[in-house]
A protein has these predicted regions:
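Single-stranded nucleic acid-binding surfaces, predominantly the OB-fold ssDNA-binding core
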Residues: 1-115
Length: 115
């Protein structure tokens, strides 16, 4: 079991078009939101859908793949690790972010033509 200390596996649907940027040193980074939905019972015992949203981060060549092939609605399987960071807003408020830095990705609805 390699690297299970900080390991995340998700299957879900892309919730928005990926955002692709370039860092100051020229490295590409892509982010997107992935929705995972599971069935749960509410207080009355009725089965309902519960959706969680996850922010995914892709670096380098993976960011290129995301930019060219991933669109809203695409079904993906990913494996990665959790990353926590914080920043301070212009108004001085501290914000915390949890993201999944993706190591591996698979297209589950088949790969599409380049955008």
């Amino acid at each position: 079991m390699k690297n299970i200390m900080n390991s995340v596996r998700l299957i879900g649907n892309v919730g928005r078009e990926p955002q692709v940027k370039e860092t100051a040193n020229g490295t590409k980074v892509a982010t997107l939101s992935l929705a995972t939905t599971e069935k749960r019972r509410d207080a009355a015992g009725k089965l309902i859908d519960h959706t969680d949203w996850h922010t995914l981060v892709f670096w380098g060549k993976q960011a290129d793949v995301v930019a060219n092939y991933v669109s809203k609605g695409e079904k993906l399987a990913i494996e990665g690790k959790l990353s926590h960071r914080d920043y301070t807003t212009k108004t001085g408020e501290k914000r915390y972010i949890t993201e999944v830095v993706v190591n591996e990705m698979a297209f589950l609805n088949g790969r599409k033509a380049e955008k």
